[in-house]
Structures are given as C-alpha cells and as structure tokens.
Amino acid sequence: MDSRLEQTKEAKLSALMQEYGTKVLRLVYLMVGDRSAAEDITQDVFVKVYRSLDGFRGESAIQTWLYKIAVNESKGYLRSWAFRRVFPASRIFRQSQTTVEAEALEKLGRENVAQLVMSLPAAYREVILLYYYGGLSIVETAEALGVSEGAVRTRLHRARQQLKPLLIEEGLGWT
C-alpha cells in the first residue's frame, strides 16, 4: 500500500478515535460491566475499524457503524468463556470523588437504575443502552443492531414496561 494512503488511513482512524473513543468505551463498558475488558474490547473495535475503513461505504452514519462494531464485539465477549461472572452495579458508572450527600444519593439512584437496566433481557438492555446512553436515534439504533425500526420501538416499549414497576418499587419514581 502507498505510504501516503496508509498515513491518510491512520489519520482517519486517529480522528475517529479522538471523536468517538470515549463514547465507544462507555457503551462497551455499559454492556460488559468491566473496565479492563471494556478497554480491550474498545481496542479491538478500533482495530476492526482500521481494517474495514476502506470498505466503509457511508450508507449509515459513522457513529452508527462504530456502535454496531462495538455492540457485536461486546456480544462476542459476553458469549465467550472470558465472561462468566456477575458484576456489581457499582462498576457501571464512574464513582464520584465528592462526598456531598446529594451527589451520593444521585449516584445511588444512577447505580440502582443501572442495575435494573442490566437485569433486563439482552435485547431490551441493548436498545436502552444505545438509545438513552449512546444517544442514537431509533433509526441509528436499528442499524447498529441490524433490526427494523419497529423492533427497536417494540423493545424500547417493552423495556420501559419492565422497568416502570421496578423503578417505582425502588422509590426512584417514573416520569
């Protein structure tokens, strides 16, 4: 390969990592619940991106394409023998360094919500993570998961139905 083309490809990868690296890491972390594994998976995601960059046709948004790779890599990890344990909800969100009571209560609420989300079936958990935490639209979530928009809407609706009584029971309300 021409060294100039290789530099261009590396520059594109660097720009993608700069813009989306943290977002991909967060999504993967939310899916697998282990910081070290999430970092490894994120690295694998960007290796795949580098290898596939020339084949990206632009039929979907670059963020959707990246998230699809991240979701697939995370699913592969969760199916593997490397992942055979339950993780605590406290590992889902970064721990706050402050000790203000209000922030502690807010953190506890986030952890409880995260624990409830992680208790959902995988199909519902994925759409919640991509739609709410990942900030993808219905269309982008459908593309990332390789399902129809209707399936995403149905899964979101059913996930909310399952979460509502759990949130009320935990005293976290429902808006």
Give names to the regions the model predicted:
Residues 127-131:
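A short pre-motif secondary-structure segment
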Residues 1-23, 30, 109-113, 118, ...:
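N-terminal module of bacterial RNA polymerase sigma factors
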Residues 71, 145-169:
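DNA-recognition helix of helix-turn-helix
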Residues 6, 46-61, 81:
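Sigma70-family region 2
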Residues 55-57, 68-89, 106, 158, ...:
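Arg/Lys-rich amphipathic alpha helix in sigma70-family domain 2
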Residues 84-115, 137:
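Internal acidic/polar
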Residues 40-47, 60-72:
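Structural recognition of an alpha-helix C-terminal capping motif at a helix-to-coil junction
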Residues 17, 25, 35-52:
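Conserved RNAP core-binding helix
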